[in-house]
């Protein structure tokens, strides 16, 4: 693979499943004067989970891709990509990332007998799938009709993404007249969602034997 196609499938054993994770939070409280206070918050987090390659063969049935009733050792068990007797390289695993960023600002002010709260928030949620190595077709090699070994990315990972952006702005004013309190306000909210999915978008090949 490395010599003929310039593709490194990764290791077949001995690789670590440890994944990075971090969280960051920052906050500023500013008392501008007696009638004005400003609060700003920022947070960011990142998680990354390592997963086995998907066992799905959508839109085909398992029996179409893996017709064998026995696994590679001759025993009765799973015959698909996650069969116990099968061997897949490091590149066949995928990582489910979870990235979240948020920003919020709040301004509290007083104007005579009126109290006002102006608030704005923005959040960005990004959950792509990533994998080891570059783009390459998914390749399954069978033995006796069951999964024997494979390399290349998980077939449902390339192009798989989910992104959500949300912005909210709110303005609320409160004033008093005697024993009565009155509140009026406005709110604006916008959301933008992006979802991507492409089964076997990099190609998927199944060989009956080595």
Language model features with spans:
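Ligand-site clamp/hinge motif
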Residues: 7-25
